[in-house]
Curated annotation (Swiss-Prot):
This is N-(5'-phosphoribosyl)anthranilate isomerase. It is an enzyme of class 5 (isomerase). The gene is trpF. The keyword Repressor does not apply. Belongs to the TrpF family.
């Protein structure tokens, strides 16, 4: 079964929207300045604390280094840490050794470091590159490239980038990911839309 993560949740209303839609995981963007979904540490920690049992809370972070990642993990207390940026495999391995959270590492399609990172991380998230990093563009990428990546990885692949109810079934059929990750694709006027969120999850489930 393909899992669903709804990311970029900003407040309790959006959290409830994602839960009612049936998302398996909820994502919170923490202190990433380029993201319009960014939360402060305290805002993120408060929302993470509201995530019920059997739903995975994911803190999306861009740490400056190992110590910064550990600081964020310790404070936020999420179930998983989604790491963006250019940390080396050695740094990711050190983070994994020092924190209890599952580690998801974000990479662009066709990344040279994806295979090495996948030997360490609990999952690899493939997202569309944007100026200054990954994610938040609302744009898809070449799914055939990501499908080829999947067969080389040693960890589950999470597909992100421009997904929405209208294209998620095609994306799953091409890539066959462990999970899909959506944010702006289930929004209307910059806010999570319960109808779109429910339709997105319904279409993912129909692929099973």
């Amino acid at each position: 079964m393909t899992r669903v993560k709804i990311c970029g949740l900003m407040d309790e209303y959006e959290l409830e929207c994602a839960l009612k839609a049936g998302a398996d995981a909820l994502g919170f963007v923490v202190e990433i300045e380029r993201s319009r979904h960014r939360l402060s540490l305290d805002e993120a920690r408060n929302l993470i604390g509201m995530v019920p049992p059997f739903t995975t809370s994911v803190a999306v972070v861009e740490p400056a280094g190992v110590d910064d990642a550990v600081r964020l993990a310790d404070y936020l207390q999420s179930d998983a840490l989604q790491i963006h940026g250019d940390l080396s495999p050695e740094e990711i391995e050190e983070i994994k050794r020092r924190v209890p959270q599952r580690i998801i590492v974000a990479v662009p399609p066709g990344s040279d470091r994806a295979v090495e990172v996948s030997r360490i991380a609990d999952a690899v998230l493939v997202d569309t590159p944007v100026s200054g990093g990954l994610g938040g563009s609302g744009r898809t990428h070449d799914w055939s490239v990501t499908a080829r990546m999947r067969s080389t990885l040693h960890a589950p692949l999470i597909l992100a980038g421009g997904l929405r109810p209208e294209n998620v079934m095609d994306a799953i059929n091409v890539v066959k990911p462990y999970a899909v990750d959506v944010s702006s694709g289930v929004e209307t006027n910059g806010r999570k839309d319960p109808v779109k969120a429910e339709e997105f999850v319904r279409r993912v489930r129909s692929c099973q």
